[in-house]
């Protein structure tokens, strides 16, 4: 038997805030009347995937690294300890590295903040933030294709207002390192967000891009298919975009929150490479595959941050 005496009533108020405009823009949130408890979920932006390299047929090449995923922080507070208005800045995801002949790194994401004033420069005013360091972008295949760094956990000073609540910081996940060998370098799910999978490398034959391996109710985000050989200019396929359980039409989900990165682009020895897949909120973009001279795939964009405030 289930007793519902202590379950929250229908007055629960959920508000969701997305990145918009400039990365330095702030929202304001006003505490509803009769609110007793406040839960805050604060997720930063994920890193963009690196672009894949390009070279003449038969030469070994490396795919771009996947972007890292952001850390996140949750906070649970008695509403009486919070001011009537708090301010929110939602981080943006990093751009993927440009494809073609540019062979560039992905950009880092940016942090998300919840503060008692519209500034992130006064540490004592910050209620919670998504992490200490933002998720890093994946390196280009021509720069060894390293995976983007994971967003680190936030360790706040005891002088912060956060001491009035229960705070749980969680680290992100490193992006996958760009491939050179035929076996795809896949991402294993380890938490709420994932890094991006890397782009495919090659010696003389096109290869499949890295995937994000599914588990339980989460499906696999499949890497882009392999392209052709030196005598076949079939392009590598683009990596798949993200899988997520959120948002829904009601801002609620039937499953736990989950945000995947993008998968890696496929490679082609004689043609253009596949692009990395785009990421869900806070996750890393997929790395671009490698291709013929000047035809490396671009990296996928990192997912924007997200702040969810629940009041009851």
Which role fits each region the language model picked out?
Residues 1, 39-41, 259, 279-284:
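Short hydrophobic/aromatic-rich beta-strand motifs
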Residues 16, 20-32, 42-117, 140-155, ...:
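Glycine-rich strand-loop-strand elements at beta-sheet edges
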Residues 129-137:
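A short, sequence-level motif marking secondary-structure junctions
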